[in-house]
Amino acid sequence: FGSLLGICLLTQIITGLLLATHYTADTSLAFSSVAHMCRDVQFGWLIRNLHANGASFFFICIYIHIGRGLYYGSYLNKETWNVGVILLLTLMATAFVGYVLPWGQMSFWGATVITNLFSAIPYIGQTLVEWAWGGFSVDNPTLTRFFALHFLLPFAITGLTLVHLTFLHETGSNNPLGIPSDCDKIPFHPYYSMKDILGFALMIIPLAALALFSPNLLGDPENFTPANPLATPPHIKPEWYFLFAYAILRSIPNKLGGVLALAASILVLFLIPLLHKSKQRSMTFRPLSQILFWTLVANLLILTWVGS
């Protein structure tokens, strides 16, 4: 799935650049600039749908990639793993600031709710939030800086990806048995290149199908209404790929406690290399660990479902 993530990143950067050429980062114009893009720009609708749904596929791939890393003990390549977790955090930040850009209702209120969480930090929280907003509420300065960040972060992700690959190259990749595979090495081309092309095809076909047949399936209908600071949507929720974390956040009555639990649900990945005590690397021959692993997967799916 690493190669698929690379393709996702490339697709997102290309479609994103094309979108940025027509986008206006201003509260009075952002919503209509996106509408203009879908109506008046050649293939603008397609580029936007690919970009919006490409994000979903990016997260599907990264979650499977992490799950596979957990299952096969890839986290024992500590540097690679830690850079990977930082990549995940950067990707989540990018997706969040990107979701705010169309300036629909859910964009505005999502931005308000999530940035407001920083106010739970003792002593400096409120100052931090007002500093992030550039004022006393989510407004034009917020949109402008979010656009700047959304433009910048994917290139940071590209840089981190190269670091990720450099560290991986030090050790070589892992395999399902978790044993050294030096004696089984084969040329990248044609073997791996063919395997990767198959993966690309298997990902691009559903992505194209989603973007062409039901582009709004995963989006929130609230976002077709321009942002209105005076009208709160009945239920504020993020895109599906953040729902598991959002469910954790909302299940804890205390604000700071919820924020800490939300952060911990992602940052726990940093601890995993330290928690590995088995003599075997992968879970292939460890049924008990397999049960726990699949329970974790089921848990995340249930949280995603509950969060919506």
From Swiss-Prot:
| GO biological-process terms attached to the record | mitochondrial electron transport, ubiquinol to cytochrome c
Q: Does the keyword Mitochondrion apply?
A: yes
Q: Which PROSITE patterns match?
A: CYTB_CTER, CYTB_NTER
Q: Subunit notes for this chain?
A: The cytochrome bc1 complex contains 11 subunits: 3 respiratory subunits (MT-CYB, CYC1 and UQCRFS1), 2 core proteins (UQCRC1 and UQCRC2) and 6 low-molecular weight proteins (UQCRH/QCR6, UQCRB/QCR7, UQCRQ/QCR8, UQCR10/QCR9, UQCR11/QCR10 and a cleavage product of UQCRFS1). This cytochrome bc1 complex then forms a dimer.
Residue ranges of the TM segments? 1-21, 45-66, 81-101, 146-166, 194-214, 256-276, 288-308
* Name the UniProt record assigns to this protein: Cytochrome b
Q: Which gene encodes it?
A: MT-CYB
Q: Where in the cell is it found?
A: Mitochondrion inner membrane
Recorded GO MF terms: metal ion binding; ubiquinol-cytochrome-c reductase activity
